[in-house]
Amino acid sequence: MFDRFLRAGRQLLGDSPATQPAQPFAGTPLRPRVLMIIHNPPVESQGGRRLTEIFGWNDPERLARQYAADLAECSYGGLQYQIVETIDADWFPLKLDGFRYTAESYVSSWRARKMHEPDRIDYQAQVAAFELIGRYERNEIDEVWFLTFPYAGDYESTMVGRGAFWCNSPPVPNTGHCDGRFVIMGFNYERGVDCMLENFGHRTESIMSHVFQHHPPAQNLWERFTRYDKIAPGQSQCGNVHFAPSSAHDYDWGNPRTVRSFCDDWYSFPDLGGPGRMVERSEWGGGDMRLHHLWWLKHLPHVAGATNGVSNNWWEYLALARDPDRPARPAGERLGRHR
């Protein structure tokens, strides 16, 4: 109760709660072990240069380091990815219809902007080629990142294994024999870290929607977290990956409107009794994609305890692919923090 009066006093005095530090991350940091697989083949006709060199695309390993650093920052040190192995896979992965690019055919297709359709990668072939289920079951890894060229056909994220559910894409089929579940991320190294954070944001939306799927509206804190002014006038909270509190349409992070929002409440979760205040685009980067996503992720609850049967540390669900209705292995058996 005292916190509510304190926040109200700050509002009257013009001391915005947004300038106040969020609560520290609860408990021991999560340290998921990542297998990173890079498809960046050399092209013989181009002097053996790799795709990134030929087309001036980003360094995959540098992208991965910045992505991990960004997530560590916006989780208040709570999510610390550990890249335990990197595989340079110097070939083009198989597509679902059996097609596979050669180095020469890919370069010519990209230059002509005539890429193969259908585009989708064969995930079952990828899981088998890199023995992903075996690595997971031997407790070597907790997550997989594929860093690939444009039109490799990867989903932004997908899930593998027993109890797998929608993770911005359907689960990888025929993997239910896996003793647990894990997430595969797909990143396009033509693009930047902003897009990688967008992938993680949609993963967040999928997992937290699943966690709260059986909660009645009054107890659905995920639905509350994602409100924005267009759908909840005067009652916006943090919005979602595509919609900031003031956005009028997808990707409209730079909308100049000023709207009332209760986004600051999430810095003091589970106390959500704040008075709200007027907010505008400069708080989340003025339209910059990466800055918006960092701002949004920093508002995710990350404290001890539980509310209505859901952990108050939502990062646990995101890092562990946890599902309160269909538990896989106990969390203590899966993360590198317990080695």
Predicted regions and their residues:
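Flexible, surface-exposed loop/gating regions in the mature catalytic domains
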Residues: 168-189, 295
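Active-site-proximal beta-strand/loop segments in catalytic clefts of secreted hydrolases
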Residues: 38-41, 147-151, 187-188, 206
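Intrinsically disordered, low-structural-confidence terminal and linker regions
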Residues: 2-21
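Propeptide-to-catalytic entry region of secreted or membrane-anchored zinc metalloproteases
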Residues: 20-134, 155-156
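Active-site recognition of the HExxH zinc-binding catalytic motif
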Residues: 190-210
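Structural recognition of the beta-strand scaffold that forms the well-ordered cores
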Residues: 35-36, 143-147, 183
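Auxiliary, metal-adjacent structural segments of Zn-dependent hydrolase domains
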Residues: 133-173
